[in-house]
């Protein structure tokens, strides 16, 4: 192996390139990997992300839900492996309405998402029940699917910051956010530990 050759050359050290290097070097044992980028890693579009994730996608078809379920599985594996260095959580996505007619739409949307593979629907119409609020941090032992809440007291108890006339909520659960920069640097460090190299430069041609 010389500085001018490599088994694999990856053009770009954004999150996609770094993830590819990680999976080749760490998971597949391909250690002669070079990343080439004229900028610092994770500095072009990778630092513009909202850093949110979700398995909550409409149809037609279940392709996006299936892709995201698999992607979230991989992210959760990395969070466990790293001690959750990139602060992955599962706070969920929350949709709220003051229009009583939309409550039934929330239930229909939740049922459609469940049919696509997003997880089961739980409807909460009374102050009691088994609604499980999301913690501020972490992702373990959290429900998948969605919760539809139509009881005013339950809404006020768990979401006191919402407007007083809120009549229904849809809480999509396998959603949240994490630090994309911390994830990227963790993957890069692990890949480098296995022999991957990062070169500053521009790829101008492929023979």
Positions of the model-derived regions?
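Beta1/beta-strand and adjacent pyrophosphate-binding region of the FAD-binding site
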Residues: 2-16, 34
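Conserved Rossmann-like nucleotide-cofactor binding loop
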Residues: 16, 41, 204
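Gly/Ala-rich phosphate-binding loop of Rossmann-like dinucleotide-binding domains
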Residues: 21, 25-26, 190
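Glycine-rich FAD pyrophosphate-binding loop
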Residues: 25-47
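Short, flexible, mixed-charge acidic loops at enzyme active sites
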Residues: 45-51, 160-162
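Dinucleotide-binding Rossmann-like beta1-alpha1 core, especially the glycine-rich loop
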Residues: 51-154, 158
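Helical element adjacent to the flavin cofactor pocket in flavoenzyme catalytic cores
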Residues: 163, 169-207
